[in-house]
Amino acid sequence: MRTLSLLTLLALAALCLSDLTDAKPSGPESDKAFMSKQEGNKVVNRLRRYLGASVPSPDPLEPTREQCELNPACDELSDQYGLKTAYKRIYGITI
């Protein structure tokens, strides 16, 4: 068993150290795998455009939240039940 393991290891080492990795395939198929730098830059630049907004959009409920914070009753209710419910109970307006 020990000799079989040693032979397998030596065969694997010989395979790794052989010059098969330096061989290049011949034919037109080998050129299709690579692209020029200009084509590669076009692909990279195209993907960067769709990253999204650089800053987050403003919260639409921020003015409502500020108005509710100024009223102590609304502020207390918003802590217990949530902003929408508290604003509706105090001001009677649906957000």
UniProtKB/Swiss-Prot annotation:
Residues 1-23 form the signal peptide. InterPro entries: GLA-like_dom_SF (IPR035972), GLA_domain (IPR000294), Osteocalcin (IPR039176), Osteocalcin/MGP (IPR002384). Bone. Gamma-carboxyglutamate residues are formed by vitamin K dependent carboxylation by GGCX. These residues are essential for the binding of calcium. Carboxylated in a Ptprv/Esp-dependent process. Decarboxylation promotes the hormone activity. Residues 46-92 form the Gla domain. It is found in: Secreted. Ca(2+) 2 binds at residues 66, 69. Disruption phenotype: Mice lacking Bglap and Bglap2 show increased bone formation, characterized by higher bone mass and bones of improved functional quality. Mice lacking Bglap and Bglap2 also display reduced male fertility due to decreased testosterone production in the testes. Mice lacking Bglap and Bglap2 are passive and show greater anxiety-like behaviors due to impaired synthesis of neurotransmitters. Keywords: Biomineralization, Calcium, Cleavage on pair of basic residues, Disulfide bond, Gamma-carboxyglutamic acid, Hormone, Metal-binding, Secreted, Signal. The keyword Isomerase does not apply. Residues 24-49 form a propeptide. Ca(2+) 1 binds at residues 69, 75. Disulfide bonds join 68-74. The carboxylated form is one of the main organic components of the bone matrix, which constitutes 1-2% of the total bone protein: it acts as a negative regulator of bone formation and is required to limit bone formation without impairing bone resorption or mineralization. The carboxylated form binds strongly to apatite and calcium. The uncarboxylated form acts as a hormone secreted by osteoblasts, which regulates different cellular processes, such as energy metabolism, male fertility and brain development. Regulates of energy metabolism by acting as a hormone favoring pancreatic beta-cell proliferation, insulin secretion and sensitivity and energy expenditure. This is Osteocalcin-2.
